[in-house]
Curated annotation (Swiss-Prot):
This is Uncharacterized protein MJ1442. It is a single-pass membrane protein. GO terms for cellular component: membrane. It comes from the Archaea. It comes from Methanocaldococcus jannaschii (strain ATCC 43067 / DSM 2661 / JAL-1 / JCM 10045 / NBRC 100440). It is found in: Membrane. PROSITE patterns: PROKAR_LIPOPROTEIN.
Length: 202
């Protein structure tokens, strides 16, 4: 277990977040084809240039993260400017997080690429203040106000999972889903966003 924790810390937690979200996708019943592209996937030249900027921002944030022993320092990281599906996800998620935490920065995002009937991405935010256990219920209410519901039928609402507090939701139109995990120990908010057909029952 110790060696696993060291591995996770060394890579900025990206692998841990990615694996957790894959489990989330499998619960949703999504066919998964991994592209493993960080910062989105585009073929146009101008988009490639944007990707390079995003990647540089994320690399700088990862270097800063590895130097932090007690979580991520909000003031020491850059707010990554997402593109593509990540931008769409950020526009939906950031207002919810800002409502609860006052202000957040996007530290990094990882795309899992196109699935058979949708697309998914994992985004990591750092709030301006420390995460507390009271934020769990506050975030729960804010998410539901934004048009998502706590799903049943195998996609449980909220609970504890290892080091984090987990919230799973599906949109009312059944076309998108989000998974939010709060990590008080590292002061991170990890959000899994999926857009596409969802196989679930209310």
């Amino acid at each position: 277990m110790t060696s696993i924790r060291i591995f996770i810390k060394f890579y900025g937690g990206t692998m841990r977040k990615f694996l957790i979200f894959l489990i989330f996708l499998s619960v949703l019943g999504c066919g998964i084809t991994i592209s493993g592209c960080i910062g989105g996937k585009n073929v146009e030249e101008i988009q490639n240039m944007q990707e390079q900027v995003v990647q540089q921002q994320q690399n700088e944030n990862q270097e800063e993260y590895q130097n932090e022993d007690e979580g991520v320092d909000y003031n020491s990281i850059r707010d990554v400017q997402p593109i593509g599906t990540a931008k769409e996800a950020d526009e939906k998620i950031r207002p919810i997080l800002n409502e609860v935490f006052g202000e957040v920065k996007l530290m990094e995002y990882v795309s899992t690429g196109k699935q058979n009937e949708g697309e998914s991405i994992v985004l990591t935010y750092v709030p301006k203040r420390k995460i507390t256990t009271n934020d769990f219920e506050k975030l729960n209410e804010a998410i539901k106000k934004s048009g998502y519901f706590e799903s049943s039928g195998g996609i449980a609402g909220g609970g504890q999972s290892g080091e984090g507090m987990v919230l799973w939701y599906v949109s009312k139109d059944n076309k998108s889903a989000i998974q939010i995990i709060l990590y008080p120990d590292t002061n991170e908010i990890v959000v899994g966003y999926y857009k596409g057909k969802i196989y679930s029952s209310q």
